[in-house]
């Protein structure tokens, strides 16, 4: 279902501040620190400034922390915004990455597969050129249930924005003409055929607002950021690639995602952009009204 439908007609270790020429090996530098990451209790963490960058793996209010510490470590990276992407990911690349998801990784075993995943490019900076299908403020959709990567904080400024990036120009045109309500509990084509990109609360530009993002729905975009496998979602309930049902409750086309987003660009009006388009054909989200 996934392969046929999403094609369409067509003290945090700041690894991210490496110079562009060195970032290709960023993946293995991150992986070399996987075994030293631990899940911890939040203690007196009360605000986003207490969480990032002081808690590199986030934390939990549980007295017995069991979350995937290396996964959170990756989520909480702060890559420099000017890092040059090492490649562009399209449909074929995401299908290939799905095929490489290690058996047995489960929800909490990212560390065991860190080197293998780094070999697939996890941790390197990549670009995705597609269309913005949906925007989700997880503060609202989670009913302010905080994630461990953000120290289980429940404040409005402590939640990620989820973006659905798809590849079907016809569906994108429909969304642009008549943007449907995004309902993660009732996923449709826009959710099931898109890859997820996440803007994290401590790395996103102040002008990357939900309102400004929603004005770009259906438009051609280029998203730049860290490639990461969110192994929590590598299952039949979440990842449509794991499901054989033509229609089901799965809500994403891949467990691989861009997280965090470092750049978000929109194709200029009157242009038809591609991965080879010059910078002059794109405009940064923060420069748009």
Regions found by a protein language model. Give the residues of each.
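Sec/Tat signal peptide C-region and signal peptidase I cleavage site
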Residues: 18-22
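Bacterial N-terminal signal peptides
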Residues: 8-17
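Bacterial N-terminal signal peptides that target proteins for export
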Residues: 1-8
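OB-fold and OB-like single-stranded nucleic-acid-recognition modules
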Residues: 23-289
């Amino acid at each position: 279902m996934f392969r046929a439908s999403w094609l369409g007609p067509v003290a945090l270790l700041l690894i991210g501040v490496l110079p562009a020429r060195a970032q290709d090996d960023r993946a293995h530098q991150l992986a070399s620190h996987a075994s030293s990451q631990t899940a911890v209790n939040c203690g007196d963490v009360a605000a986003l400034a207490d969480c990032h960058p002081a808690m590199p793996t986030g934390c939990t209010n549980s007295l017995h922390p069991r979350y995937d510490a290396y996964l959170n470590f990756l989520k909480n990276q702060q890559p420099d915004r000017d890092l040059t992407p090492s490649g562009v990911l399209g449909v074929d690349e995401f299908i290939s990455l799905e095929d490489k998801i290690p058996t047995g990784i489960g929800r909490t075993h990212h560390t065991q597969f860190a080197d293998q995943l780094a070999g697939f490019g996890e941790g390197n900076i990549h670009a995705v050129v597609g269309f913005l299908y949906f925007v989700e403020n997880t503060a609202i959709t989670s009913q302010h249930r905080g994630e461990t990567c953000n120290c289980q904080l429940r404040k409005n400024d402590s939640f990620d924005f989820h973006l659905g990036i798809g590849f079907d120009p016809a569906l994108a045109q429909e969304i642009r003409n008549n943007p449907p309500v995004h309902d993660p509990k009732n996923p449709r084509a826009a959710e099931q055929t898109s890859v997820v990109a996440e803007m994290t609360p401590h790395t996103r530009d102040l002008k990357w607002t939900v309102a400004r993002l929603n004005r770009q729905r259906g438009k051609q975009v280029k998203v730049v950021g860290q490639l990461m496998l969110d192994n929590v979602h590598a299952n039949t309930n979440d990842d449509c690639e794991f499901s054989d049902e033509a229609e089901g409750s799965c809500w994403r086309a891949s467990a691989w995602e861009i997280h965090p987003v470092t750049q978000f660009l929109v194709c200029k009006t009157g242009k038809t952009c591609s991965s080879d388009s010059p910078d002059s054909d794109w405009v940064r989200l923060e420069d748009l009204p």
